[in-house]
Amino acid sequence: MLRWTVHLEGGPRRVNHAAVAVGHRVYSFGGYCSGEDYETLRQIDVHIFNAVSLRWTKLPPVRPAARGQAPVVPYMRYGHSTVLIDDTVFLWGGRNDTEGACNVLYAFDVNTHKWSTPRVSGTVPGARDGHSACVLGKTMYIFGGYEQLADCFSNDIHKLDTSTMTWTLICTKGNPARWRDFHSATMLGSHMYVFGGRADRFGPFHSNNEIYCNRIRVFDTRTEAWLDCPPTPVLPEGRRSHSAFGYNGELYIFGGYNARLNRHFHDLWKFNPVSFTWKKIEPKGKGPCPRRRQCCCIVGDKIVLFGGTSPSPEEGLGDEFDLIDHSDLHILDFSPSLKTLCKLAVIQYNLDQSCLPHDIRWELNAMTTNSNISRPIVSSHG
């Protein structure tokens, strides 16, 4: 029984950030926030959410190892990707309005909180943003995005073997997925499932004739081939900047935006790769408002979703030009315990807590007390 169980405000106000789950913690890297100074080049920020205490913390800036020597830290960016392999977060791609896009690989040690730039070889992908990254074993797969130098959408797949730090451009077989950015790619078994994103009627080049594909495309990492997929009778609307995650061998997507429909979404869909069918899911409880560019991480049987941007309530759900960046966080529980359901009842009906054990009162307080590290709200335009 899926249920939205937690809604807290006051976390990092972020759009187009990237995040990974490490145990019971979620690490969030960078992103954009309306009203912040992005002309001045600065270090990427790192926020950590503790899924037990339900509290956010922010890591302090990295100090130079020696006087006059700049620390090895990625610059602040958005549209980048992060993946976790062992105890290392690999951050790649993204862009900044001052420096443009980047193709330097950064490694972040979750134990020491230190950054490094591993020496890589092979065919390094061109600098881009809006790509996807997913992991199979010790290999990271990069697909799509918008390449800065070529000034076009990509449908290439690159892989990085992190045991040898070697990049490879995969010569794929079969009918490739269309060029796109801000899609999702989710690894289920040895297959990469690509959904959504923004494409263009004129192929790789951007002409403002946008296409929002709602067909699942599947890439087999063993044969390095795009598979021919059967038609699906029920489909979500095509969208970009949504969230996707795998749970119990199935694919889920949430939210996103379709410019042709001028619509933001807050629907949740489940895709079964065996029957190749979609099903719309209606969780219990109050979920997030329609949004795009949020982050979503799985922690055990829970989904932690935070940030993103939505139309201003005064403008309705479809206005592209007045957006509000979010500092909220929502938790979707796939298997809420009886204890969790009881705590929700105490909160919903404002029941007396004085007779409850101290640890239960502490948990109730954590579930209802907002964080306080977000910037003041600012509208964005465009």
Curated annotation (Swiss-Prot):
Q: Which GO terms describe its biological process?
A: meiotic cell cycle; proteasome-mediated ubiquitin-dependent protein catabolic process; protein ubiquitination
Query: Which species?
Result: Bos taurus
- InterPro entries with a match to the protein in the record: Kelch-typ_b-propeller, KLHDC3-like
Intervals holding Kelch repeats: 25-77, 88-138, 139-189, 191-249, 251-301
Q: What is this protein called?
A: Kelch domain-containing protein 3
Q: What is its main location?
A: cytoplasm
List the molecular function annotations (GO) for this entry. chromatin binding; ubiquitin-like ligase-substrate adaptor activity
UniProt entry keywords in alphabetical sequence? Cytoplasm, Kelch repeat, Meiosis, Repeat, Ubl conjugation pathway
SUPFAM superfamilies with a match to the protein in the record: Kelch motif (SSF117281)
A Gene Ontology term for the protein's cellular component: cytoplasm
Task: Report disulfide bridges, numbered on this chain.
Answer: none
What pathway annotation does it carry? Protein modification; protein ubiquitination
| Subcellular localization(s) per the UniProt record | Cytoplasm
In the record, what lineage is assigned to the organism producing the protein? Eukaryota, Metazoa, Chordata, Craniata, Vertebrata
- PANTHER family recorded: KELCH DOMAIN-CONTAINING PROTEIN 3
